[in-house]
């Protein structure tokens, strides 16, 4: 989440097809800005709505945040994808993830994520099924 100099991006532009970033602060705003600055497609390579500063032992991957972020990124014509960070098995060492130690899904959050993905899928099918 450290700033990157525009000079670095400008130097790389002739050699790249897509800009790919991690962003745990404001990915919707930042990816929109990078797309507008460069004209390049952007990919949210790693992000999550985890409350990192929470005192809770387990920190769920926030399904509502995911759904809101996915919908907002979908409105960015330059955004080509979103990779969720922390979609691992939750255990006592790695205290976040979409599956618990017995591989049971965090249904509350997974269901919200699934519904968001299905909404985008329906839009894609309608838009491109000609």
What are these regions (language model features)?
Residues 1-76:
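Extracellular glycoside hydrolase catalytic/binding regions
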Residues 15, 85-130:
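Aromatic-rich peripheral "rim/lid" segments of glycoside hydrolase catalytic domains that contact
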């Amino acid at each position: 989440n450290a700033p990157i100099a525009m000079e670095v991006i400008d130097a790389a532009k002739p050699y790249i097809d897509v800009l790919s970033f991690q962003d745990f602060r404001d990915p919707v705003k930042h990816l929109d800005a990078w797309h507008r600055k460069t004209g390049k497609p952007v990919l949210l390579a790693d992000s999550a709505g985890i409350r990192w500063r929470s005192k809770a032992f387990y920190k769920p991957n926030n399904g509502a945040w995911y759904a809101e972020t996915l919908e907002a990124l979908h409105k960015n014509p330059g955004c080509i994808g979103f990779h969720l960070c922390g979609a691992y098995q939750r255990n006592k060492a790695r205290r976040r993830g979409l599956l618990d130690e017995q591989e049971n899904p965090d249904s509350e959050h997974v269901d919200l994520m699934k519904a968001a993905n299905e909404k985008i899928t329906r839009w894609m099918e309608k838009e491109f099924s000609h």
